[in-house]
Swiss-Prot record:
InterPro entries: P-loop_NTPase, Thymidine_kinase, Thymidine_kinase_CS. The gene is tdk. ATP binds at residues 16-23, 89-92. PANTHER family: THYMIDINE KINASE (PTHR11441), THYMIDINE KINASE, CYTOSOLIC (PTHR11441:SF0). Its EC number is 2.7.1.21. Disulfide bonds: none annotated. GO terms for biological process: DNA biosynthetic process; thymidine metabolic process. The keyword rRNA-binding does not apply. The active site is at 90 (proton acceptor). This is Thymidine kinase. Its main location: cytoplasm. It is found in: Cytoplasm.
Length: 193
């Protein structure tokens, strides 16, 4: 990725299913910016507390400190003037105001790196992610490996008690006992009834 002068702002988006390495890639980009002596601020939605409330944590345990926010506009309120790079994990959990927040920060001449799921467990566009992708200068769509057949996986399979979640189940489950797997288009199952 060639960024050129950052005085005009830049939006990067990292998407894909669970287990595709989105948070790991986000952390890698953050660390590279820090090595280059760029000031970085990292944000995440407060609803994402599966591993830590104040860290972005990948499934393999790699982590970096983050500021947890409830509402997207808090990112602008907490943004420090000399920050050059802003990283936002799990963007799908924010409401659609995250689109305007990301745009506003980029318009300040900042590099904004967002990561999140582009599709929900149904295989449908997830929250504001598609709209953030649309305004980005760069989108990287990562894949995982399908646990059923070994092909590239682009979808997240939700399992409840070992069975595929039904289409009408809630999109976001907080504190539920569900598990997830990476699946390809063919092996992804979402029963309608």
């Amino acid at each position: 990725m060639i960024y050129g002068s950052l005085d005009h702002g830049f939006i990067e988006v990292i998407v894909g299913p669970m287990f595709s390495g989105k948070s790991e890639e986000l952390i890698r980009r953050i660390k590279r910016a820090q090595i280059a002596k760029q000031k970085v601020q990292v944000f995440k939605p407060a609803i994402d507390d599966r591993y830590s409330i104040d860290k972005v944590v990948s499934h393999n345990g790699t982590n970096i400190n983050a500021i947890s926010v409830v509402k997207a506009f808090e990112i602008i309120e907490l943004l420090e003037e000399d920050t050059e790079v802003i990283a936002i994990d799990e963007i799908q959990f924010f409401d659609h105001s995250i689109v305007d927040v990301v745009r506003e920060i980029a318009d300040l001449g900042k590099r904004v790196i967002c990561a999140g799921l582009d599709m929900d467990f149904r295989g449908e566009p997830f929250g504001p992610t598609p709209d953030v992708m649309a305004i980005a200068e760069s989108v990287d769509k990562l894949t995982a490996i399908c646990v059923k057949c070994g092909n590239p996986a682009t979808r997240t399979q939700r399992l409840i008690n070992g069975k595929p979640a039904k289409y009408d189940d809630p999109i976001i489950l907080v504190g539920a006992h569900e598990t997830y797997e990476a699946r390809c288009r063919k092996c992804h199952e979402v029963p309608r009834t």
